Amino acid sequence: MPDDPTLTRRGFLTGLVAAVFAAAHGVEAASCPPTEDNPQGPFYVSGAPFRVGIAPDDEPGERLVVTGRVLSATDCRPLPGAVVDVWHASDAGAYYGMEGAGGDDAWRLRGRASTGPTGAYRFETILPGRYPLGPRRLRPRHIHYLVTHPAHRPLVTQLYFAGDPFLEGDGLVRRSLIVPLASPPAAGGAPKRLAATFDVVLSPLKQ
């Protein structure tokens, strides 16, 4: 039985109207899901300085550069003016600024960055150490994040590194928060540094 041209035309117009409505209201086929949250933990200290290098030259551990962008979940656009606040454990598994951690600089391995037009941020640090959770367990290497933006909901989360044998069985780890560790060749005699990229997607205050 041939298709009814009236019904075919009606279906086409219905689809066209839906497409126009979606475009007008910012609805896109491609999704940009918000970054999953993760506990803040007890070691956060507010007021960290704005700086790229959060590990002094004398800080023990493998050198690491972490870069990424802060994006909006609405349309995946970069968010200038976001503040990325990070902190993590030393190579020995201690958090500076906490009792018993040692060191004379409470802001070691802590810092903030403000994103520019591309939403980009960068930190130069060391690969975080692990620390014990009981006699037989270690927390995998991780970096804590607190990301804020005036028009978006604050996000508290953690970044984890692929290949860490202690990821398995850690109840806090989420697959989406695990990123690969790269080891790019050092140029011009510069010291070798590991590299990781972690983009953060924030939910808008109003949807």
What are these regions (language model features)?
Residues 1-20:
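N-terminal secretory signal peptides and thylakoid transit peptides that target proteins
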Residues 27-184, 191-207:
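Beta-strand-dominated extracellular/periplasmic modules and repeats
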Residues 22-26:
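Hydrophobic membrane-targeting signal helices
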